[in-house]
Amino acid sequence: MFHQFFGENMLRADVCNAVEELGQLLDHTGPVLQSERNAARIFNADHLFFVTNGTSTSNKIVWHSTVAPGDVVIVDRNCHKSVIHSITMMGAIPIFLMPTRNHLGIIGPIPKEEFEWKNIKKKIDANPFIKDKNVVPRVMTLTQSTYDGIVYNVEMIKEMLDGKVDSLHFDEAWLPHAAFHPFYKDMHAIGA
């Protein structure tokens, strides 16, 4: 309605299109569009959009387009602060997957048992903020890879949670190179 009232020209004049020949990140045109399509091809993705604010903003985009207030979400307890911020902003109810710690207190991997539905269900049942104990969690967010280089088998996790969670979100800020080396087969979500 806003767009219909003011029109295309007024809204386009409100953003900087300093060099039209170079394309625009906001409307995905010209060389920017060509570059995004090429990156999507390289990463074996259906679509790819450049985000210039980093993966913190990317995480928030995922959450704001997926999660509604009161939704139950499953989150890696070692997740990035942008995910915690998104939980707060969206008013979601988190269920945390707990990583291990070694004798020095360094955070390790999340044990496979934490991903088993029976254990997630126990956490849902024990959470006093969740009224519908048969709720389907809206999203599961997992840091892939962690700051310490811990990676998870994405295919195994997808298989374990198939049909149990609406969306799987792997925060791969530290793993963009995984698609380019066979060592990481099944260890990244991009193009999986």
Where are these regions (language model features)?
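Conserved PLP-enzyme active-site core in the AAT-like
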Residues: 27, 38-42, 55-192
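Conserved N-terminal alpha-helix of the aminotransferase class I/II PLP-enzyme fold
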Residues: 5-57
